[in-house]
């Protein structure tokens, strides 16, 4: 299985060809590769960081017995510099390390920490390294990094996995990311999709195991936007392990070396619903050692996903949306629903004659062979708003359905955040939020980057201070995503009838705990006979 598994046709030759930029450049007698800076933060105040810097020095010459060289480094703008002289023999690839024990200047007091969205600033530093021979610089590298610690454990009431950033618990409100179908990743598209992602309010992106490791620019933007990344390694439960283990492990190594300096990179997972390749955890510990790891997406405190399709929104509140049983609990890696694209996008996808009346064969083809039941279940739910007489009317009502489902999903998880709700919930990864190609089962936006109502209602539900209504209990709760408390705040609920006459109003004073929820702050009493 690949990233195209829910599409109408598989992507031909998807495992061949060049899909990233290739650069050719010249260096002097020696070259630098794969710089890495590792932070160790002092507990419990996180007021000191011990930095360990390493870089590979390569002498690719075959015509000399050895070269005396010097590597110099600096953390730009921090008055921190260091250097080391050594010899590299011909053909040697030497790992040169600068430790805080050897270089006390690499102990940073009061470091500016990096935080995910809503939790603090996205502070970043620059590391610059040069290598010289006889005073002449042969090569230089520069990398950006952030100082932070991300850990996780299963010390929770239900043994579900909970994440921590710089020692503080982090409620995960994340999504699954699927790569563009033909891997046509321009910087402009990447920026647009991550800008939408940040606008939505989510704090983590799962690089689903059937996909890829995204571009350097993708990770750069995640660093700047405060978006965490859960990186999986290209295996799923629907397929066998790679035939060429050495090639697979080489891919893991090159990928980790490429992305490990990014503070947004939070977690490694070997596969989607499968098992790991033997030796993977040992390799990750050798190459990185600063991030958590699990062998597949549904283990170690992360249960299996669902639902994947539209349901009556009340089922999210009742916790009956999944045929597999309770899924609003613990850490769910895949829970979501599609949203119909706008009518303009639908007209770009198919002929008018297939739009209305709905041509089931064509629509199912554009729904991954009917995977999301857009012509049956989704259509039935849209019809709850009344029968439609045109595709324009149907598409508009389809936005209403997508909006209420997205809002219901996020707000149910808000209510049950960590210790505050009826059940302990540590994280949700919405399945999925971006579209890899044109499909009638759209998400927060379509492949052509046209937003749906799902984006705006997700953004509303995930605003850092958010008042929300529980359709099952008729209560109003207030959710706080900041690491600070808010006392003596007033929440007001008003009810209007169909003629815009206010028929109910009530207020309550709430004290919002840091990163907490004031659940059921007030109850709405609907007047009898309201319409």
PLM region descriptions:
Residues 11-12, 155-304:
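Active-site mouth of glycoside hydrolases
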Residues 1-208, 213, 415, 419-425, ...:
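Secreted/periplasmic carbohydrate-active enzymes, especially glycoside hydrolases
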Residues 3-6, 13-17, 24, 30, ...:
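Substrate-binding clefts and catalytic carboxylate motifs of secreted carbohydrate-active enzymes
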Residues 149, 297, 432-434:
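A general secondary-structure junction signal
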Residues 123, 164, 188, 246, ...:
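A generic "alpha-helical surface" signal
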Residues 33-35, 139, 253-363:
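Active-site region of glycoside hydrolase catalytic domains
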